[in-house]
Amino acid sequence: DQAVGTLLEALKKTKRMENTFIIYFHDNGACPEHLSGNGWNTANNILAKAEKAGKTIAVGDKYDIPMGGPMTYGSVGHNWANAQNTPMRRYKSNVHNGGACTPAIVHWPAGLKTKPGSISKQRGHVVDLMATCLELAGAKYPEEFKGGETKPHESLSLVPILKGKTVDRDHAYVFNHSGTHAIVKGEYKIVREGRGPWALYHLAKDRTETKNLAKQDPERVTEMVSIWEKRWGKKK
Protein backbone atom coordinates (compact mmCIF):
# COMPACT_ATOMS: atom_id res chain seq x y z
CA ASP A 1 0.00 0.00 0.00
CA GLN A 2 2.88 2.37 0.73
CA ALA A 3 4.33 1.75 -2.72
CA VAL A 4 1.00 2.55 -4.36
CA GLY A 5 0.82 5.82 -2.45
CA THR A 6 4.38 6.72 -3.45
CA LEU A 7 3.58 6.02 -7.10
CA LEU A 8 0.40 8.12 -7.03
CA GLU A 9 2.22 11.04 -5.43
CA ALA A 10 4.85 10.91 -8.18
CA LEU A 11 2.13 10.94 -10.85
CA LYS A 12 0.52 13.98 -9.23
CA LYS A 13 3.80 15.87 -8.98
CA THR A 14 4.64 15.20 -12.62
CA LYS A 15 1.07 16.10 -13.69
CA ARG A 16 0.52 12.68 -15.27
CA MET A 17 -2.27 11.52 -12.99
CA GLU A 18 -5.14 12.44 -15.32
CA ASN A 19 -3.89 10.42 -18.28
CA THR A 20 -2.44 7.38 -16.49
CA PHE A 21 -4.44 4.16 -16.58
CA ILE A 22 -4.55 2.77 -13.03
CA ILE A 23 -6.32 -0.47 -12.13
CA TYR A 24 -6.26 -1.68 -8.54
CA PHE A 25 -7.53 -5.12 -7.51
CA HIS A 26 -6.70 -8.05 -5.27
CA ASP A 27 -6.07 -11.64 -6.18
CA ASN A 28 -8.58 -13.55 -4.05
CA GLY A 29 -11.23 -13.42 -1.36
CA ALA A 30 -10.75 -13.38 2.42
CA CYS A 31 -8.11 -15.75 3.79
CA PRO A 32 -9.16 -18.77 5.92
CA GLU A 33 -5.65 -20.02 6.64
CA HIS A 34 -4.50 -20.57 10.21
CA LEU A 35 -0.95 -20.84 11.46
CA SER A 36 -1.49 -24.04 13.44
CA GLY A 37 -1.24 -27.80 13.36
CA ASN A 38 -4.86 -28.24 12.36
CA GLY A 39 -6.67 -27.51 9.12
CA TRP A 40 -4.85 -25.55 6.46
CA ASN A 41 -1.37 -24.86 7.73
CA THR A 42 0.60 -23.65 4.73
CA ALA A 43 2.78 -21.45 6.93
CA ASN A 44 3.69 -24.05 9.56
CA ASN A 45 7.34 -23.80 8.57
CA ILE A 46 7.27 -20.34 10.20
CA LEU A 47 6.23 -21.90 13.51
CA ALA A 48 9.04 -24.45 13.32
CA LYS A 49 11.64 -21.76 12.64
CA ALA A 50 10.34 -19.59 15.48
CA GLU A 51 10.32 -22.50 17.94
CA LYS A 52 13.88 -23.41 16.99
CA ALA A 53 14.92 -19.82 17.65
CA GLY A 54 13.14 -19.80 21.02
CA LYS A 55 10.54 -17.26 19.88
CA THR A 56 6.76 -17.19 20.00
CA ILE A 57 4.47 -16.07 17.21
CA ALA A 58 1.16 -14.44 18.11
CA VAL A 59 -1.48 -16.25 16.07
CA GLY A 60 -5.08 -15.26 15.40
CA ASP A 61 -6.77 -12.10 16.64
CA LYS A 62 -5.05 -10.90 19.81
CA TYR A 63 -6.70 -7.82 21.31
CA ASP A 64 -3.61 -6.87 23.33
CA ILE A 65 -1.02 -7.34 20.55
CA PRO A 66 -0.68 -5.05 17.49
CA MET A 67 -0.99 -7.47 14.59
CA GLY A 68 1.09 -7.14 11.44
CA GLY A 69 4.60 -7.37 12.83
CA PRO A 70 7.14 -10.09 11.94
CA MET A 71 6.18 -12.20 14.98
CA THR A 72 2.43 -12.10 14.37
CA TYR A 73 0.10 -14.02 12.08
CA GLY A 74 -3.38 -12.56 11.91
CA SER A 75 -6.05 -15.04 10.86
CA VAL A 76 -9.80 -15.48 11.18
CA GLY A 77 -10.36 -19.09 10.12
CA HIS A 78 -12.79 -20.64 7.64
CA ASN A 79 -16.08 -19.45 9.10
CA TRP A 80 -15.21 -15.78 9.42
CA ALA A 81 -13.42 -15.80 6.06
CA ASN A 82 -16.65 -17.04 4.50
CA ALA A 83 -18.59 -14.33 6.37
CA GLN A 84 -16.19 -11.63 5.17
CA ASN A 85 -17.01 -12.57 1.58
CA THR A 86 -20.77 -12.28 2.08
CA PRO A 87 -22.83 -12.80 -0.01
CA MET A 88 -20.31 -14.77 -2.10
CA ARG A 89 -19.61 -18.42 -1.33
CA ARG A 90 -16.35 -19.71 0.17
CA TYR A 91 -12.96 -17.96 0.35
CA LYS A 92 -9.33 -17.82 -0.77
CA SER A 93 -7.91 -21.03 -2.32
CA ASN A 94 -11.38 -21.98 -3.57
CA VAL A 95 -12.78 -21.14 -7.00
CA HIS A 96 -16.32 -20.41 -5.86
CA ASN A 97 -17.00 -16.69 -6.22
CA GLY A 98 -15.99 -15.94 -2.63
CA GLY A 99 -12.46 -16.98 -3.52
CA ALA A 100 -12.20 -16.00 -7.18
CA CYS A 101 -14.46 -12.98 -7.71
CA THR A 102 -12.98 -9.66 -6.60
CA PRO A 103 -13.60 -6.00 -7.49
CA ALA A 104 -11.30 -3.87 -9.63
CA ILE A 105 -11.09 -0.10 -9.25
CA VAL A 106 -10.10 1.86 -12.35
CA HIS A 107 -8.85 5.47 -12.38
CA TRP A 108 -8.23 7.20 -15.71
CA PRO A 109 -9.99 10.59 -15.95
CA ALA A 110 -8.70 11.37 -19.45
CA GLY A 111 -9.74 8.03 -20.94
CA LEU A 112 -12.72 6.56 -19.09
CA LYS A 113 -16.07 7.17 -20.75
CA THR A 114 -18.10 5.96 -17.80
CA LYS A 115 -19.68 8.06 -15.06
CA PRO A 116 -17.26 8.65 -12.14
CA GLY A 117 -18.09 6.33 -9.27
CA SER A 118 -20.24 4.06 -11.41
CA ILE A 119 -20.12 0.27 -11.11
CA SER A 120 -19.93 -2.17 -14.00
CA LYS A 121 -20.88 -5.79 -13.39
CA GLN A 122 -19.30 -6.97 -16.63
CA ARG A 123 -16.76 -9.75 -16.30
CA GLY A 124 -13.02 -9.38 -16.65
CA HIS A 125 -9.98 -11.40 -15.61
CA VAL A 126 -6.39 -10.63 -14.73
CA VAL A 127 -5.33 -12.31 -18.00
CA ASP A 128 -7.29 -9.62 -19.86
CA LEU A 129 -4.77 -6.97 -18.82
CA MET A 130 -2.47 -8.14 -21.61
CA ALA A 131 -4.91 -7.34 -24.43
CA THR A 132 -6.09 -4.21 -22.62
CA CYS A 133 -2.61 -2.71 -22.26
CA LEU A 134 -1.65 -3.69 -25.80
CA GLU A 135 -4.68 -1.85 -27.17
CA LEU A 136 -4.19 1.24 -25.00
CA ALA A 137 -0.50 1.44 -25.91
CA GLY A 138 -1.10 0.78 -29.61
CA ALA A 139 1.38 -2.09 -29.32
CA LYS A 140 1.50 -5.41 -31.14
CA TYR A 141 1.86 -8.74 -29.38
CA PRO A 142 5.25 -10.21 -30.40
CA GLU A 143 5.30 -13.26 -32.64
CA GLU A 144 8.75 -14.30 -31.41
CA PHE A 145 10.95 -13.76 -28.36
CA LYS A 146 14.68 -14.51 -28.12
CA GLY A 147 14.52 -16.52 -31.30
CA GLY A 148 11.54 -18.61 -30.26
CA GLU A 149 7.95 -18.44 -31.44
CA THR A 150 5.53 -17.08 -28.84
CA LYS A 151 2.22 -18.72 -28.00
CA PRO A 152 -0.94 -16.69 -28.67
CA HIS A 153 -2.27 -14.95 -25.58
CA GLU A 154 -5.76 -15.82 -24.33
CA SER A 155 -6.63 -12.29 -23.32
CA LEU A 156 -9.68 -10.18 -24.20
CA SER A 157 -9.39 -6.40 -24.12
CA LEU A 158 -11.33 -4.55 -21.42
CA VAL A 159 -11.13 -1.28 -23.37
CA PRO A 160 -14.75 -1.49 -24.66
CA ILE A 161 -15.94 -1.73 -21.04
CA LEU A 162 -13.74 1.23 -20.10
CA LYS A 163 -15.43 3.13 -22.91
CA GLY A 164 -18.83 2.45 -21.38
CA LYS A 165 -19.93 -0.25 -23.82
CA THR A 166 -21.68 -3.51 -22.99
CA VAL A 167 -19.73 -6.50 -24.27
CA ASP A 168 -21.17 -9.95 -24.91
CA ARG A 169 -18.46 -12.25 -23.54
CA ASP A 170 -18.95 -15.91 -24.34
CA HIS A 171 -15.27 -16.65 -23.81
CA ALA A 172 -14.57 -19.55 -21.42
CA TYR A 173 -12.51 -18.77 -18.33
CA VAL A 174 -10.78 -21.82 -16.80
CA PHE A 175 -9.90 -22.03 -13.09
CA ASN A 176 -7.70 -24.65 -11.43
CA HIS A 177 -6.42 -23.89 -7.95
CA SER A 178 -5.71 -25.91 -4.79
CA GLY A 179 -7.76 -28.87 -5.92
CA THR A 180 -10.80 -26.82 -6.92
CA HIS A 181 -11.82 -26.40 -10.56
CA ALA A 182 -14.23 -24.20 -12.50
CA ILE A 183 -15.28 -23.08 -15.96
CA VAL A 184 -17.12 -19.79 -16.47
CA LYS A 185 -18.73 -19.30 -19.86
CA GLY A 186 -21.39 -16.75 -20.63
CA GLU A 187 -23.98 -16.70 -17.84
CA TYR A 188 -23.05 -20.13 -16.48
CA LYS A 189 -20.38 -21.67 -14.27
CA ILE A 190 -19.46 -25.24 -13.38
CA VAL A 191 -17.36 -25.87 -10.29
CA ARG A 192 -16.13 -28.87 -8.32
CA GLU A 193 -13.84 -29.66 -5.41
CA GLY A 194 -11.31 -32.42 -5.89
CA ARG A 195 -12.72 -35.31 -7.91
CA GLY A 196 -16.27 -34.62 -6.77
CA PRO A 197 -19.22 -34.05 -9.11
CA TRP A 198 -19.52 -30.85 -11.11
CA ALA A 199 -22.10 -28.31 -9.91
CA LEU A 200 -23.76 -25.90 -12.35
CA TYR A 201 -24.79 -22.35 -11.49
CA HIS A 202 -26.63 -19.72 -13.52
CA LEU A 203 -24.56 -16.70 -12.49
CA ALA A 204 -26.92 -14.16 -14.05
CA LYS A 205 -29.60 -15.23 -11.56
CA ASP A 206 -27.53 -16.90 -8.83
CA ARG A 207 -24.18 -15.16 -8.42
CA THR A 208 -23.91 -16.52 -4.89
CA GLU A 209 -23.86 -20.11 -6.22
CA THR A 210 -26.59 -21.58 -4.02
CA LYS A 211 -28.78 -23.38 -6.60
CA ASN A 212 -27.07 -26.32 -8.28
CA LEU A 213 -28.69 -26.89 -11.69
CA ALA A 214 -26.52 -29.85 -12.76
CA LYS A 215 -29.38 -32.37 -12.62
CA GLN A 216 -31.78 -30.05 -14.46
CA ASP A 217 -29.35 -29.20 -17.26
CA PRO A 218 -26.93 -32.14 -17.74
CA GLU A 219 -26.30 -31.26 -21.40
CA ARG A 220 -24.84 -27.89 -20.45
CA VAL A 221 -22.65 -29.55 -17.82
CA THR A 222 -21.34 -32.01 -20.41
CA GLU A 223 -20.64 -29.19 -22.85
CA MET A 224 -18.70 -27.18 -20.28
CA VAL A 225 -16.83 -30.21 -18.93
CA SER A 226 -15.60 -30.85 -22.47
CA ILE A 227 -13.89 -27.44 -22.31
CA TRP A 228 -12.15 -28.53 -19.11
CA GLU A 229 -11.04 -31.85 -20.60
CA LYS A 230 -9.75 -30.15 -23.72
CA ARG A 231 -7.61 -27.89 -21.54
CA TRP A 232 -6.50 -30.27 -18.79
CA GLY A 233 -7.36 -33.77 -19.98
CA LYS A 234 -9.81 -36.25 -18.48
CA LYS A 235 -7.57 -37.30 -15.60
CA LYS A 236 -7.01 -33.83 -14.14
What are these regions (language model features)?
Residues 4-7, 20-29, 103-106, 129-134, ...:
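Beta-strand elements within well-structured catalytic alpha/beta cores of enzymes
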Residues 23-26, 34, 91, 107, ...:
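Generic beta-strand/beta-sheet core signal
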